[in-house]
């Protein structure tokens, strides 16, 4: 059977790259800068942002042109530590949502930029063998970066002195790249 010359090819789906981070502008703005650059340099890839329902991203992402998903996350409380007793339930809900997102979106890579949305997303991807990376903006890496630096493939540092505070995996590669910014 031959196809009609008027037959339209179905649109090809671009490969998805999750960029997870937020909570504050210090984590969200680098995520947006990476997404912009990825869109510009790799039109074959679609950056999809992952953040928290309670973070700054809940306000800023609807104003952007990127697809995004907001997860039912809360920060790890340091001063009001008793609020952390909710974390088992939060973790269960986030895990369910990540299973759904990873099955429907099928990301080819996950990049974390820190903040409480970054940790679960990068960890989930690394456990499934999906290529992972972290971009750390600070000289003193945050909790997510310090914990995940053992299991990710690449760590991109905004400041080279952060390297001394990381415990890296045997195959983790570290790059001093500076911090991504939105012009």
Label for each model-derived stretch:
Residues 97-110, 118-133, 146-151:
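Glycosyltransferases and closely related glycan-assembly transferases
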